[in-house]
A protein has these predicted regions:
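C-terminal amphipathic alpha-helical "assembly" element
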Residues: 1-32, 101, 182-184, 188-199, ...
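N-terminal beta1-alpha1-beta2 module of alpha/beta enzyme domains
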Residues: 1-67, 158
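Active-site mouth loops of central-metabolism enzymes
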Residues: 5-18, 71-83, 154-164, 219-226
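Glycine-enriched alpha-helix->loop->beta-strand junction motifs that scaffold or abut catalytic
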Residues: 31, 62-65, 96, 174-181, ...
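Glycine-rich, proline-tolerant flexible connector loops at the mouths of alpha/beta enzymes
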Residues: 34-59, 74-76, 108-113, 183-189, ...
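A short, GP-enriched loop/loop-strand-helix hinge that lies immediately N-terminal to
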Residues: 67-71, 101
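Internal, glycine-rich beta/alpha segment that forms the wall or movable "lid"
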Residues: 78-178, 189-196, 200, 204-209
Length: 272
């Protein structure tokens, strides 16, 4: 099971950039897999942008191995044009020499009338990366032939996730051929329910529609303690592929963040 970090960008307690750099470089030295930057959520559940992509662009030049995860809110065209996302993501992937992961964050439950636009946005994004020259015609959009550059370093494209907090989100990730990142913070029973919804939905789709490899990750709180070790053992035994541990906006600040990073990378926490 991969071990990764989660920063929420845009919150009042967002760390100073040099502090974050120090923490991420420590994580890279200790073998942590990915650092994810997500926008913070408001009281109404909507996401504040917070410009995670800018933070990741800066991290790309200050790190060498650790992968860079971008949590992108509101990927429902035309509110966020897929072409701009394709360009920004490819630029980060190039500057990091192929280390980008992209997780799409719904602003709310995916309503039935939004599903077609959301699915179409994902397909447009993938085609912009894959095709030498992009064009698109549908009842919603008409895009004449255009060069979408740059292209990402990873082929055919960076791994794509749907981040969500319900069984419906998990099923949408499976049906869309994406990886799924559970940000519900639920109990193990809830996490397993979401995982099973994802696995069942993904098993029923055409292999040609798979966008990314099957993967199910969870974002969580985790203290450096024996209880934390037991929780990691439990999640790994349940078959989760990646765990993201929050290291921003902690009561203990930078010291607590470094403690969590060292714990996550320790031999005690690496079960198998």
């Amino acid at each position: 099971m991969k071990r990764s970090l989660l920063y929420q960008i845009g919150a009042a307690e967002t760390p100073e950039f040099e502090t974050m750099i120090e923490e991420v470089q420590l994580a890279e030295t200790l073998g942590i897999d990915t650092v994810w930057c997500f926008p913070s959520a408001g009281e109404d559940g909507s996401f504040r942008d917070g410009a995670p992509s800018i933070w990741l662009s800066a991290l790309a030049s200050r790190t060498e191995r650790i992968r860079l995860g971008w949590g992108l809110a509101g990927m429902t065209p035309p509110s966020r044009p897929p072409m701009r996302v394709a360009e920004q993501a490819a630029a980060i992937d190039l500057s990091s020499e192929g280390r980008l992961e992209l997780a799409l964050l719904p602003d709310a439950e995916l309503r039935q009338d939004d599903e077609g636009a959301w699915d179409e946005g994902v397909r447009m994004l993938v085609d912009m990366w894959d095709a030498p020259r992009f064009s698109w015609t549908s009842p919603r959009f008409t895009v004449p032939p255009v060069d979408v550059v740059p292209k990402p370093a990873q082929h055919p494209h960076p791994p794509l996730w749907l981040a969500g907090w319900s069984a419906e989100h998990a099923a949408r990730a499976g049906e869309g051929g994406l990886a799924f990142l559970d940000i519900s913070g639920g109990t193990d029973q809830t996490l397993v329910l979401h995982r099973d919804a994802y696995t069942e939905a993904r098993a029923g789709i055409d292999p040609n529609d798979l966008v990314s490899m099957a993967s199910c990750g969870i974002a969580t709180e985790l203290d450096a303690s024996p209880d934390g070790v037991e929780r990691l053992i439990g999640w790994e035994d349940l078959g989760f592929d990646e765990v993201l541990v929050r290291v921003s906006s902690l009561e203990g600040g930078h010291a607590e963040a470094c403690e969590r990073i060292r714990f996550l990378a320790s031999e005690d926490a690496r079960v198998h």
